[in-house]
C-alpha cells in the first residue's frame, strides 16, 4: 500500500541518494546567486519556520531548504529538533492502517480505492489554483511527480474534476494537454478546459467522432450527449467541429453518418437555447442562394414559419432551376413544418397552406443526382403523391370537429397515407401531442384508442421510426394517470405493453426487452404487468434466438416474482420450455 498515497514513503528513488544531494549542493550555484545579499539571519528564520510545520520532512523541497539553512550558517541541532517534534507521520499512519485492514481480510484493491478516493475528496476540497500555478512557475519544467500521476486512472480523473472546477488554472490546463499528449484524449470529452486548446480539442474531437461512428446507431444514445456537450462548449468549438463534419459529410463512405451526427449536434444546441442557424446555413449550400438563406435564417432564428418567407422558398422551388433540395433538409426547419401542419389546433393561412405542403413534400420526396458538384437530374416522381398524402392527413389531424369515432371511419385513408415516411413522422408527432393531453385517456372508452392503433401501423411500415415510437410508449407508460382509477390504469398500461410487444414483433427487440428488464430491476412497476408482457412475448416468439436476446429475456423469466406464477393452459408451459431451450443451447454470462 506504500503507493496508495503520493509521497507516503521517502525513498532514494524519489529524493535521490545522499551522494546526489551532495552533488546538487556543489552545483547549486544558481540558487546561491539568487539568494546573494540575503541576510543569513533572515534565511535561517525562514527555513526554521518551514521546519516547524507539520511533517515538513516529507516535503519534496526538504533538501533545498536544508541546503539554504546550512549555507546560511544554521545549526543542525535546531533542524533535528524541529523536524522530529513536528513529524506526525500522516502518510506512514495511512500505510499502517491500510496494512492492518488487509491483514483483517479486506481486499487490497478495496483498501487502495478507499485511501485514494478520500485523498481525492480532500484535494478537491482544498485545492488552491494560485498555489498550484506558483509551484509550476517555480519548478520551471514539468515536475516528475505530475508525469507519474497522469499514468494512473484515479489521478487523471482527479485532474478532470479539478479542471472543470478551475478552468482558469494554468497548471491544470497544462496537465490536461499533458494527458492528451500521453494518448488519453478519449477520456477528456467532458473536460471544458480541453475546449480552450485547439491542439487538444482537435485530438479529442477526432477520437470522440471515431468512437461514435464505430459504435453505430445502438450506442448513439450513450455516446452522443457527451460529444454534443463538448462541441457546444462555445461558438469557436461549435464552428470548428461543424466545419470539420461538413467536410467529412461529403465523403461517399460514411459521409451520411457524419451528417447525421452533425444534425444531432445542431438539435442539441437548439434545445440548449443556442441559435446556430447561421452557422448551419453558412456551411451548407445556402450561401450560394442569399434570398433563400435569408428566408431560412429568419424562420430558424424565430423558431416559427411565416407566409412571407415560405412564399420566397415556394417560388424558388417551383422554378425551372430550383436550388438544391439539401438546402431545405435542415432537421430544425422540418420540425417547424411538423408543428405547423400536424399539431392539433395549429392555425395556418389557407391561402398559403399549399405552399407549406409543397415545400415539406419537396424536401421529403425529391431525389437529385450530382456529378462533380453539378446536378445532372431531378426526380420529382413522388412529389405529387407525397403532397396529396400530407394534405389529406393535415386536414384530418387539424380538424378539431373530428373526434375519435370519426377518425375510425378514416383509418383506411390514414393507413394508406402513413406509408409515406414524412406523413408517418407527422402522425407520430400528432399522436404524441394528442395523447399527452391530461384528459385524453379519461375520455376514451375503447380498449385500444385509435391513436395508439396508429402507432402499430407506423411500427409496421417504418423501421427508422421505431426508437421514437418506443420513446412515446415509455413516456405514456411512466406517466401518472391520476384521473383514472387503479384498474383503469392497469388496463391502459397493458394496452401500452401490447404496443411494445407489436414493436418487438416488427424487429425492435433488444431495446423493448431492455426497458422491461429495467422496470423489473427498479421495482417500480406492478409485477402483474411484467408477467403480462412475458406471456405476450412468449406467445409471439419461437427459436432460434440470438444470444443477446436470451441474455436479456431469460433473467426476467427466472426472477422469483415471475417464475412459476404464470398460468398455463393444459400441458403446454411456454415459460418452462423457453428456459429449458436456453439452458441447453446457451451459456449464460452473469
Curated annotation (Swiss-Prot):
GO terms for molecular function: RNA binding. Widely expressed. Expressed in heart, brain, lung, placenta, liver, skeletal and cardiac muscle, adrenal, thyroid, kidney and pancreas. Its main location: nucleus. The keyword Cell inner membrane does not apply. Changing residue 384 to M: Reduces RNA binding. GO terms for biological process: negative regulation of transcription elongation by RNA polymerase II. Keywords: Nucleus, Repressor, RNA-binding, Transcription, Transcription regulation. The keyword Acyltransferase does not apply. It comes from the Eukaryota. It is found in: Nucleus. Changing residue 372 to M: Reduces RNA binding. Changing residue 371 to M: Reduces RNA binding. One of its GO terms (cellular component) is membrane. Essential component of the NELF complex, a complex that negatively regulates the elongation of transcription by RNA polymerase II. The NELF complex, which acts via an association with the DSIF complex and causes transcriptional pausing, is counteracted by the P-TEFb kinase complex. (Microbial infection) The NELF complex is involved in HIV-1 latency possibly involving recruitment of PCF11 to paused RNA polymerase II. The NELF complex is composed of NELFA, NELFB, NELFCD (isoform NELF-C or isoform NELF-D) and NELFE; NELFA and NELFCD form a stable subcomplex that binds primarily through NELFCD to the N-terminus of NELFB. Binds RNA which may help to stabilize the NELF complex on nucleic acid. In vitro, the NELFA:NELFCD subcomplex binds to ssDNA and ssRNA in a sequence- and structure-dependent manner. Interacts with ARAF. Interacts with PCF11. Interacts with KAT8. PANTHER family: NEGATIVE ELONGATION FACTOR C_D, NEGATIVE ELONGATION FACTOR D. Belongs to the NELF-D family. This is Negative elongation factor C/D. It comes from Homo sapiens (Human).
